[in-house]
Amino acid sequence: MGRIEKSIEIGAPPEKVWELLALDRLPEWMDVLEMKSGKYISEVHTPKDKYKVGATAHIVEKRWEYDLDISESLENEMITVHSKGKYPYTITCTLKPVDDGTKLMYTSDYESKGILGKAFGKLFAGTLEKQVERALEKLKSILEK
């Protein structure tokens, strides 16, 4: 099991950062996953439904497709999503108000299956961390425009 932990301060209030944590908004900034699209497959009747526990989206990436579901959610404070598929991972984003905006703390736990998967996981851990840093910088850039 691998883990990535990163944080960034964003010059926007937690409510604005929260909006971009919706599963269908991840492709706008999360290049690390090479997402092409994200569409809710659970019922979404109101904007708040996008963040409720049990909400599920189908994600299409460059190399594969899978579903993401929300397992924890506290509006404008914390959200945890879990992937169901070939390469399982869990991402938790925690938001804390700071003087000039929001501190976002990103944690990802991912599983590399099999002997080759574990070997590649160790080799690419640094690359994954850099991709997460780039994604967080892109999120910051979008929100600070």
Label the model's feature ranges.
Residues 1-48:
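Hydrophobic ligand-binding cavity/cleft-lining segments
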Residues 3-5, 64-68, 88-92:
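Short, surface-exposed coil-to-beta transition loops
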Residues 4-6, 55-57, 91, 104-106:
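Hydrophobic residues positioned within well-ordered beta-strands of beta-sheet architectures
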Residues 13-15, 71-76, 94-103, 141-145:
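A short, structured loop/turn motif at beta-sheet edges
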Residues 17-21, 26, 57, 70, ...:
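Hydrophobic pocket/interface hotspot
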Residues 39-85, 134, 138-145:
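Glycine-rich portal/gate segments that line the openings of hydrophobic small-molecule binding cavities
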Residues 82-134:
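Beta-strand/loop substructures that line and gate deep hydrophobic ligand-binding cavities in soluble
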